[in-house]
């Protein structure tokens, strides 16, 4: 018979798959909206360029002619933002209810489970730093505002470059919109669509995690902490691999998502029955899924990766880190700092000079 922590670990993995399917459905609706807008943008860009002879080109003139383009783009992204905000608000309500019902159905009836304030959690999700990149992190609401301005600037710059280079109108439009023969995958708009896809997936993961962490905090008396759970496959980032399986106190630790399109999640770690004052057998070690089937829940990413080929190890870690991993038995978590940030090779070399020397690197 499964223990509570075992059941919760299984549920966390299954639930993350459901959230991925949900985010994909939101993405499809957003892309359909943007595709409809892109047709209008193509017509407006063509009309603007036809009214802008190369000999009369000025930045001010271009900006004036692109007013309708900017307006159409702004309206489209207002609709995108509204759709995302509505979906995320509904997601908070769903996730809060899901976690509450999961605990209610999994824990003994003697245990009292607390619910979260959905409005407060949604506000926290919008305000919590979200975009993890070389530029740092910003709150989700600020991230959403920046999407529209970013695409508008790319459109303007592409047109400006084309006019300065003396390119014909159809070539400029193709650069922005893409070509039909390639299903428009070669245009700037496709880049924007991919950006939106990554943002939506990460926003869903971010919002679900904020809801979970707030739920954990409300039920802190029941929990030892929370566990970082990364997907065990060759696409997992070094950052997530280094954190997988680690347990952190409630309210602290590096939380998922760690990067755009992050697939990591979290699971609560219930206190022992003795600590909860309940006379039941202690929880045992659980199991969770990898692409290879069932693996122990206490199996770290390093243990999983050591069973893979050198090519898989190098694909995930890079050639230098892969060699260190194999020859010196360095665990994956040694390639990151305490916050899960990947150390550069120079930083690793300074920190592990002797190991680099032994490996002949």
Task: Give, region by region, the residue ranges found by the protein language model.
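N-terminal leader/targeting and assembly helices and adjacent pre-domain segments
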Residues: 1-183, 275-361
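Acidic, glycine-rich two-metal-ion catalytic cores of nucleic acid-processing enzymes
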Residues: 173, 183-284
């Amino acid at each position: 018979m499964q223990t509570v922590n075992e059941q919760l670990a299984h549920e966390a993995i299954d639930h993350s798959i459901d959230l991925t399917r949900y985010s994909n459905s939101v993405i499809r609706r957003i892309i359909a909206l943007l595709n409809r807008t892109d047709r209008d943008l193509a017509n407006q860009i063509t009309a603007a360029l036809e009214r802008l002879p190369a000999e009369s080109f000025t930045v001010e003139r271009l900006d004036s002619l692109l007013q309708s383009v900017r307006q159409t783009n702004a309206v489209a992204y207002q609709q995108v933002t509204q759709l995302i905000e509505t979906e995320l608000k509904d997601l908070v309500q769903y996730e809060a209810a899901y976690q509450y019902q999961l605990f209610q159905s999994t824990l003994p009836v003697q245990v009292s489970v607390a619910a979260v304030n959905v409005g407060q959690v949604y506000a926290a999700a919008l305000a919590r730093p979200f975009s993890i990149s070389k530029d740092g992190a910003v709150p989700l609401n600020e991230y959403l505002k920046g999407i529209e301005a970013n695409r508008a600037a790319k459109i303007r710059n592409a047109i400006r470059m084309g006019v300065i280079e003396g390119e014909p109108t159809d070539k400029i439009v193709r650069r922005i919109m893409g070509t039909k023969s390639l299903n428009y995958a070669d245009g700037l708009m496709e880049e924007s669509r991919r950006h939106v896809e990554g943002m939506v997936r990460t926003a869903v993961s971010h919002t679900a995690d904020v809801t979970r962490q707030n739920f954990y905090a409300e039920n802190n008396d029941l929990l030892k902490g929370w566990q970082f759970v990364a997907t065990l496959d060759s696409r997992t980032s070094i950052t997530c691999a280094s954190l997988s399986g680690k347990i952190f106190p409630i309210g602290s630790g590096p939380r998922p998502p760690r990067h755009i399109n992050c697939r990591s999640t979290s699971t609560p770690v219930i206190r022992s029955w003795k600590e909860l004052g309940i006379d039941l057998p202690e929880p045992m070690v659980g199991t969770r899924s990898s692409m290879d089937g069932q693996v122990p829940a206490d199996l770290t990413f390093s243990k999983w990766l050591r069973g893979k080929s050198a090519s898989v190890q190098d694909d995930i870690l890079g050639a230098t880190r892969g060699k260190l991993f194999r020859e010196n038995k360095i665990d994956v978590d040694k390639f990151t700092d305490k916050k899960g940030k990947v150390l550069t090779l120079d930083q690793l070399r300074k920190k592990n000079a002797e190991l680099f020397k032994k490996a002949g690197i």
